[in-house]
UniProtKB/Swiss-Prot annotation:
NCBIfam families: thrS (TIGR00418). This is Threonine--tRNA ligase. Residues 1-64 form the TGS domain. Catalyzes the attachment of threonine to tRNA(Thr) in a two-step reaction: L-threonine is first activated by ATP to form Thr-AMP and then transferred to the acceptor end of tRNA(Thr). Also edits incorrectly charged L-seryl-tRNA(Thr). The keyword Metal-binding applies. Pfam families: HGTP_anticodon, TGS, tRNA-synt_2b, tRNA_SAD. It is found in: Cytoplasm. It comes from the Bacteria. GO terms for cellular component: cytosol. Its main location: cytoplasm. Binds 1 zinc ion per subunit.
């Protein structure tokens, strides 16, 4: 007699089921309504088909309301789309169709590429397939059978995929009616469970296996959600994101541009560079009390990168150079043929600075900060404005401390990161601890100690925030050289951006032989903590532009005020107003052109000037100003002195404002 299966339910109850019982059987044993709404099961956290036989462990019944169902909905939608394409265009080959963030795609081999006009036809056919409600059924095929069947269908890409599957691994074939595909699964019970909350978004070209030497395929992107409301919200967010696109706003605001001769590197215009320098100046002030700002070389011999390990595990992302003479005159035996690398990271340089001279435990912690320009190779297709570049500035720091100082340093870093984000208006922050990956350096004892310290720090962060900061664990997601905190912030339209990190490093100090002299006069390896707040300054600026939709806070804006006159009779007074604001430290331009005032206001609104001061005869006579804010129809009239005082306060960076307020409070 077969042994019974023991299942533990989320409420802690334990029940036995006969061997061979499926997930659907378990759901039906609870209620018919649950069985009807169930789309899959999870055994010990692993999502499986509802039709799979259950095994001993902790079971969860997954319904469409479960967040994990979203990946299944999108996965199944990709299969339905592939079937729809082959019904509409027989002879089209299917290749791969994974789930991606917020959706899915499928790559097809088709004689003529898809056009946007094809998408509504495919959507209509998908709805027909969903209405058929064909069950997803799974079969295990032999390698020979799979190759034979797919070859007979003319699916050469599937034959290649079968060959790539390791020997001894099951080949799963999922059927939905007469259509089938090679797939690892899992899937929901039927095509009907996909629902109709989906939309095909765009078509694109893609090389097979991402290799430009291979055939160009035709890719269709789609999105799918649990219900129509979620789909509508997502489409609204996309529309908002398009309006906020920093590349579009960057052109309108005359901040920066890119060009073919420098792919992935920014050409900063005057206004854009002013914002960049404002961010750097702000960060520099925030670090002044606790950090030494250093600067390590951008170009270093590859021998250093071999020692650090970057040349071995990061080489494909690095740029290497040698002298132009050596490259163009290989026959010259006297030429310097050494190969140098543009630094992709600042950390090895900071270790060299720490190592220069003997360090005592009494000097620790030593905190080295740098606004270091780094270069990393990115495929041209992955480049995306300021968000994904090849050359960028990191607000990097490395703390060298004792084991006992690690917790206090991590908390100090956390306080600084959260304070910076708050100054830029970000309130919703998530802090997650990434723990040891399978492949790593350092002993288990070192990892145990570091993870224990960082777990306690995470608990302290959560407790101190009184619920304002969300925390979590990312098992196995740590760097190979140590555990790390990841800081993710949410912007004005709900998108999440991972920016800050705090990483413990067991690797570099050992590789470079870094040490300090401890209280017993022994050489001891320091704990090294990598820390970034903005991460890439360029990317953070892009996030700010999109978060504020170009309506930058006055203290960040490159051009803070435009003084525009209604009549030439007010030009002299307008100049006086502009000079008063400039004397107070604001960035001001004047617009005394012979144009209508509404035209001037519209023009400066397009370039996102936050404050427009309008001066006419009345204002000149009364020594007042008329203030108009970007995005508002309201007008505020006030005296010149009061306006200067008010705008000066608003244009003062928050860190400077806090210091002034604290000084004032102390004096009182």
């Amino acid at each position: 007699m077969s042994q019974a299966i023991s299942l533990t339910f989320p409420d802690g109850s334990v029940r036995s089921f006969p061997a061979g019982a499926t997930g659907k059987d378990v759901a039906e044993s609870i209620s018919k309504s649950l069985a009807k709404s169930a789309v899959a099961i999870a055994i010990d956290g692993a999502v499986r088909d509802l039709s799979d036989a259950v095994t001993d462990g902790k079971i969860e019944i997954i319904t469409r309301k479960d967040g994990r169902a979203l990946e299944l909905i999108r996965h199944d939608a990709a299969h339905v789309m592939a079937e729809a394409v082959q019904e509409l265009w027989p002879g089209t080959q299917v290749t791969i169709g994974p789930v991606i963030e917020n959706g899915f795609y499928y790559d097809f081999a088709k004689n003529e590429p898809f056009t946007p006009d094809d998408l509504p036809k495919i959507e209509k056919k998908m709805k027909e397939i969903i209405a058929r409600n064909a069950p997803f059924t799974k079969q295990i095929w032999s390698r020979e059978k799979a190759k034979e069947v797919f070859a007979a269908k003319g699916e050469q890409y599937k034959v290649e995929l079968v060959d790539a599957i390791p020997e001894g691994q099951d080949l799963k074939i999922y059927h939905q009616g007469d259509w089938f595909d090679l797939c690892r699964g899992p899937h929901m019970a039927s095509t009907g469970q996909v629902g109709t909350a989906f939309k095909l978004m765009k078509v694109a070209g893609a090389y097979w296996r991402g290799d430009s030497n291979n055939a160009m395929l035709s890719r269709i992107y789609g999105t799918a959600w649990a219900d129509q409301a979620d789909l509508d919200n997502y489409l609204h967010m996309l529309a908002e994101a398009e309006k906020r696109d920093h590349r579009k706003l960057g052109r309108e605001m005359d901040l920066f541009h890119f060009q073919e001769e420098g792919p992935g590197v920014v050409f900063w215009h005057g206004k854009g560079w002013r914002i960049f320098q404002t961010l750097v100046a702000y960060m520099r002030r925030r670090l002044a009390a606790d950090y030494q700002e250093v600067n390590a070389p951008q170009v270093l011999d590859t021998s250093l990168w071999e020692t650090s390990g970057h040349w071995g595990w990061y080489q494909e992302n690095m740029f290497a150079v040698k002298s132009a003479h050596a490259m163009t005159h290989p026959e010259d035996k006297e030429a310097d043929n050494r190969v140098f690398a543009l630094k992709p990271m600042n950390c090895p340089g900071h270790v060299q600075i720490f190592k220069h001279g003997l360090k005592s435990y009494r000097e620790l912690p030593i905190r080295l900060a740098e606004f270091g320009l780094v270069h990393r190779y990115e495929p041209s297709g992955a480049l995306h404005g300021l968000m994904r570049v090849r050359g960028f500035t990191q607000d990097d720091a490395h703390i060298f401390c004792t084991d006992e100082q690690m917790a206090a340093e991590c908390l100090k870093i956390n306080d600084l990161i959260l304070s910076v984000y708050e100054d830029f208006g970000f309130k919703e922050i998530v802090v997650k601890l990434s723990t040891r990956p399978e492949k790593r350096v350092g002993s288990d004892a070192l990892w145990d100690r570091a993870e224990a310290v960082m777990t306690d720090v995470l608990k302290t962060i959560e407790a101190q925030s009184e619920g304002r900061i969300k925390t979590g664990i990312l098992p196995g997601e740590g760097a190979f050289y140590g555990p790390k905190f990841e800081y993710t912030l949410k912007d004005a339209i709900g998108r999440e951006w991972q920016c800050g990190t705090t990483q413990v490093d067991f690797n570099l100090p050992e590789r470079f032989g870094a040490f300090y002299i401890d209280s017993n006069s022994e050489k001891t390896q320091p704990v090294m903590i990598h820390r970034a707040i903005c991460g890439s300054m360029e990317r953070f600026l892009g996030i700010l532009i999109e978060n504020f939709a170009g309506h930058m806070p006055l203290w960040v804006s490159p051009l803070q005020v435009v003084v525009a006159t209604i009549t030439s009779e007010a030009d002299a007074y307008g100049l006086e107003v502009a000079e008063a604001l400039r004397d107070a430290g604001l960035n001001v331009e004047t617009d005394f052109r012979n144009e209508k005032i509404n035209y001037k206001i519209r023009e400066h609104s397009v370039t996102k000037v936050p404050v427009i001061i309008v001066c006419g005869r009345k204002e000149a006579e009364e020594r007042t100003v008329n203030i108009r804010r970007l995005g508002s129809q309201d007008q505020v009239s006030m005296g010149l002195d009061a306006a200067v005082e008010s705008l000066t306060l608003e244009a003062t960076p928050p860190d400077i404002r806090r210091k002034a307020e604290a000084k004032k409070a102390k004096a009182a």
